[in-house]
Amino acid sequence: MISVSSREEEVREATHGVAQFAKGDSIYHQGDVANQWFEVVSGMVRTCRFMADGHRQLTGFYYSGDVFGVDGHRRCESAEAVTDVVVRRSPISIPGDGMDDAPQPFERALESARRSIFLFGHRTATNRVAAFLIEVAQRSELAVGVQLPMTRSDIADHLNLTLHTVSRTIRDFAKKGLIELNGRQHLRILDPTGLRRLAGDATDDGGEARLLGHWTSASGVTQ
């Protein structure tokens, strides 16, 4: 017979601490009970919503330090590991029961939502792809080398564009000298000012310096 304390410990282990997921693993599914939120320790996570007609809307990419899974009673979307992932999980608190003890994670979750809303505010395919590449470069903490392991299909679903449109737009950027493609897995931003202009000047004032010299590993440039 399992004691009450043993059951409590099992529940605690299931909702606290660090967990690892292999590339392609599901972290949770749309419709699951939402009893914990997650912080990315390493790797990349994507969240997506599946519509009744089978269409997938990719709602966000989450990097190290990002928070996701701050939902209501039920999950409104699924979360999947884009790469091998390590996450830190914590129980979702109710108002008045510890939420005030950890405001920063919730603020970071809201910031991720604001970034997505801002990205979708761009009207044209050119605007969206340019803004996406700028965001990826700016979020890198490395002077050189930004891994972007999502596929081009992922980028298309995230930006609500077709795969063909994303591929064509990236090629157009290269032809115009805005970026340099290095094989099929890397690109370099050559003209930050021009790319910012195409994005509608949608980056912060200090962003241009961080774009110079950045290399983006883009399986996103592969299907």
Regions found by a protein language model. Give the residues of each.
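Phosphate-/nucleic-acid-contacting segments
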Residues: 137-223
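Polybasic "coupling" helices that flank or enter modular domains
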Residues: 99-163
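A short beta-strand-loop-beta hairpin characteristic of the jelly-roll/cupin
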Residues: 45-57
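Cyclic nucleotide-binding regulatory module and flanking cytosolic helices
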Residues: 1-23, 63-68, 73-74
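Cyclic-nucleotide recognition modules
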Residues: 58-111, 115
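Glycine- and acidic-residue-biased ligand/ion/polar-headgroup-sensing regions
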Residues: 24, 35-48, 64-65
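Short phosphate-coordinating micro-motif centered on Lys-Gly-acidic
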Residues: 27-32
